[in-house]
């Protein structure tokens, strides 16, 4: 349940910043998604390490998380771009593409963090 709450909070940070950067600031869509993903994942990592998994700081774990986030970064930005293109960048496509990209990355993150990363000492 803690992972879901943490993911929800990080998702709000990610989506909120994405919309502000893309729609309000006028940044290019992939750059907006990239920046919002980075801020959202840093938020998620800090909360997950301290609250969700209650893990002590670890250099090995930090490196593993950064590698995982690098992979999910590509998944997120790529899926978001693909979905927006397939849906012709309509206004309603923004949250749809975000949910698909975020949902896919969240599943990958949870499985790898639970099974591998937070078992590292």
Curated annotation (Swiss-Prot):
Signal peptide interval: none
One GO CC term on file: plasma membrane
TM segment ranges: 3-23, 27-47, 62-82, 92-112
Primary residence: membrane
Residue runs in coiled coils: none
Pathway annotation: Cell wall biogenesis; cell wall polysaccharide biosynthesis
Residue numbers on the Cytoplasmic membrane side: 1-2, 48-61, 113-121
One of the GO BP terms on file: capsule polysaccharide biosynthetic process
Keyword Nucleotide-binding found: no
Location in or out of the cell: Cell inner membrane
Induction: Is cotranscribed with dprE1, dprE2 and aftA.
Keyword Translocase: no
Keywords linked to the UniProt accession: Cell inner membrane, Cell membrane, Cell wall biogenesis/degradation, Membrane, Transmembrane, Transmembrane helix
Periplasmic-side segments: 24-26, 83-91
InterPro entries reported in the protein's UniProt record: GtrA_CellWall_Glycosyl, GtrA_DPMS_TM
Domain of life assignment: Bacteria
Gene inactivation effect: Cells lacking this gene display impaired growth and abnormal cell morphology, since they are shorter and more swollen than wild-type cells. This phenotype likely stems from the decreased incorporation of arabinose into arabinogalactan observed in the disruption mutant. The mutant also accumulates decaprenyl-phospho-arabinose (DPA), the arabinose donor required for the synthesis of cell-wall arabinans. The lipoglycan fraction comprising LAM (lipoarabinomannan) and LM (lipomannan) is not affected.
Subunit structure comment from the entry: Interacts with the priming arabinosyltransferase AftA. Also interacts with the galactosyltransferase GlfT1, which initiates the polymerization of the galactan domain of AG. Is thus probably part of an AG biosynthetic complex.
Function of the protein: Required for arabinosylation of arabinogalactan (AG), an essential component of the mycobacterial cell wall. Probably acts as an anchor protein recruiting AftA, the first arabinosyl transferase involved in AG biosynthesis.
Family statement: Belongs to the GtrA family.
Protein name: Arabinogalactan biosynthesis recruiting protein Rv3789
Organism: Mycobacterium tuberculosis (strain ATCC 25618 / H37Rv)
């Amino acid at each position: 349940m803690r992972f879901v709450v943490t993911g929800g909070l990080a998702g709000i940070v990610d989506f909120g910043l994405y919309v502000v950067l893309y729609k309000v600031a006028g940044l290019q869509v992939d750059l907006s998604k990239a920046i919002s993903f980075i801020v959202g994942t840093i938020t998620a990592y800090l909360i997950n390490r301290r609250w969700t998994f209650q893990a002590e700081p670890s250099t090995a774990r930090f490196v593993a998380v950064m590698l995982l986030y690098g992979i999910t970064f590509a998944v997120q930005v790529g899926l978001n771009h693909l979905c927006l293109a397939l849906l012709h960048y309509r206004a309603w496509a923004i949250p749809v593409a975000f949910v698909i990209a975020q949902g896919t990355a969240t599943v990958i993150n949870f499985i790898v963090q639970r099974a591998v990363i937070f078992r590292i000492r």
